[in-house]
Amino acid sequence: EDFEQVKSDIIRLRQIFSHIDKIRIMGGEPLLNPDLIKYIVMIKQNFPYTDLRIVTNGILLKNISKELLECINENDVMIDISVYPPLVNKMDSIIKKLREKNVKVFIENIGKFKPILLNKKRMYPYKELRDCNCINLREGYLASCPLVFTIQYINDNYNNKYNYTTNKINIYK
């Protein structure tokens, strides 16, 4: 997503909310974003007391730059590592390196891959929304589930016709 769009959205959220408890920078893979430092600084300028986290599968942490490590420490950012089964044995050395650099780390062991539950009948749409409770910000909208923003890509690229709609809120209206 475009940095200026995200910046505008964060500034707008600051106008609406005096504080946001937790903000997670997610992906894809946020460590692939060459502007990650800019995002961290901008978010902390607008929400200095928020619990800011970078959510990653950890693969790229072994090559994390000194500048990014400094930014993470200076801005009190936590690294949330989602450890998937194929990566369990590779994470110990990476986590050790981060902790030696005084980086706060949260480990979530993912025991198995979970499929995205999409069915055309959607017998329990409220349950689906309740179970997908991570508020997402994208291009001026808030939604309670990231599928609202990604389902069209899934449909277009995999020739599916899932009709997964839910309310999303325009933060500019």
Language-model region placement:
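Non-cysteine beta-strand/loop elements that form the S-adenosyl-L-methionine
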Residues: 75-87, 105-110
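A general structural motif
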Residues: 18-22, 49-51, 74-76, 102, ...
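A cross-family glycoside hydrolase active-site/sugar-binding cleft signature
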Residues: 24-26, 53-57, 80-82, 108
